[in-house]
Structures are given as structure tokens and as C-alpha cells.
A protein has these predicted regions:
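Residues at the starts of beta-strands that form the adenosine-phosphate
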Residues: 3-5, 36, 59, 128
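Electropositive phosphate-/nucleotide-binding environments in soluble metabolic enzymes
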Residues: 15, 19, 84-88, 147, ...
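S-adenosyl-L-methionine/SAH cofactor-binding core of RNA-modifying enzymes
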Residues: 30-115
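C-terminal folded domains that constitute the principal catalytic or ligand-binding module
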Residues: 103-104, 112-183
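Short, acidic/turn-prone active-site loops that include or flank metal/cofactor-
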Residues: 13, 44, 67-69, 132-137
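Short, charged, surface-exposed secondary-structure boundary motifs
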Residues: 18-19, 50, 72-73, 137-143
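Short, glycine/charged-enriched secondary-structure capping and boundary segments
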Residues: 21-23, 76-78, 119-122, 145
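N-terminal beta1-alpha1 ligand-phosphate binding loop
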Residues: 2-28
């Protein structure tokens, strides 16, 4: 039974890059019975209907950093615990146990592209937002001029898997990431 669904909403330019770590996520988790990963190419003018439907039913969350000016429901996930960042905006924390949100979107793009994707996708702005607080800085070395404190897509997924108890899946991804990052 699928316990977690990850949608890698990927910018078209990212699909062509040899340094894209979203493909590693798909490769590492493709055999998992608990986790499903789908790559969806982001379209500015035509949102994916499944994501729209899940968003409208409030069953879709967005893994994206906190923004100081947000008024939406936002959680910080640290050491396996959800912490409300805007308690007035929601009623229940999305835990693996209560199953309230098992569908999560990750923006697979550069930070500049991801910010643009979020701005131009109203349905994503209305999603519950999950911010991860990693214990360590990024180890990703294949791109220059990275935003301080930012993680690549594979690192975000590893952190999410760690924090939500999918340790074996996280370790499989970590092995692939370590090899990929040595190039």
C-alpha cells in the first residue's frame, strides 16, 4: 500500500540537465511499495489536473521553505516532529499516522525557477506548506552559485524520508546521491 506520493514538479529546463537529482529520486524509489514518485513537467498555462484536484480537496502539500510574509498553513518538520508555523491557518497536522496528507509536491528546479513556478501556480500557493529544517548543510557540489542553506531535490527528499520514518528508502537514495555527487 502506498503511504507517500511525491510529485516532482519539474521545470522543463531541469529535465535536460545532467546535474538534475530528481532522476536519482525516481531511480532510488521506483521499487518501493510504500512510496510512489512521479515526475510532472511544470506548465505555466496548463496545470496538471491531478494536482489541481488534490489541491482543491486539500490533500496536497508543498515542500518549500518558509517565507516570513506567508499567512498560509505552514509546518516545520524537524527531528520527526511537525511544528505549526501559522497555527491559525489549519486544524490538523499532516502526519503519516492520521494520513491527512500523503501527496507532496516538490519543485524540481533552480531556486530562481522554483520561486517563479510558485508565483505562477495559484493552486500551489493554497497548499499546506512543509518546510524542512535539515541538520546539516547541502553536500551537493555539481552546480555553482547555490543559495545558502538550500538543498538540491534529492537532499530534500532524503530529509523528508528521514523525518517521516522511511529510513531504508532514504539510505537507498543516499547511496545513489553520493556516487552521483562524485562526478
Amino acid at each position: 500500500m502506498t503511504e507517500l506520493v511525491l510529485y516532482l514538479l519539474t521545470h522543463s529546463r531541469e529535465l535536460q540537465k545532467s546535474t538534475n537529482t530528481g532522476a536519482l529520486v525516481v531511480q532510488a524509489l521506483s521499487a518501493s511499495l510504500k512510496i510512489k514518485v512521479e515526475v510532472i513537467e511544470w506548465q505555466r498555462k496548463a496545470a496538471d489536473q491531478r494536482l489541481l484536484d488534490l489541491s482543491e480537496r486539500q490533500q496536497l502539500g508543498l515542500v518549500y521553505p518558509l517565507q516570513a510574509d506567508t499567512a498560509q498553513a505552514c509546518y516545520l518538520l524537524q527531528q520527526g516532529q511537525y511544528q505549526a508555523q501559522n497555527p491559525a491557518a489549519f486544524t490538523e497536522l499532516p502526519t503519516r499516522q492520521n494520513g491527512s496528507i500523503k501527496h507532496w509536491v516538490l519543485l524540481d528546479a533552480t531556486w530562481q525557477e522554483a520561486a517563479k513556478m510558485l508565483r505562477q501556480s495559484p493552486y500551489l500557493q493554497s497548499c499546506y506548506r512543509l518546510a524542512l529544517k535539515p541538520d546539516a548543510p547541502s553536500l551537493y557540489k555539481l552546480r555553482r552559485n547555490q543559495k545558502a542553506g538550500a538543498l538540491c531535490t534529492a537532499e530534500v527528499v532524503m530529509e523528508l524520508l528521514q523525518q517521516t520514518g522511511f529510513i531504508n528508502e532514504k539510505e537507498q537514495l543516499m547511496l545513489l546521491f553520493d556516487e552521483f555527487n562524485k562526478r
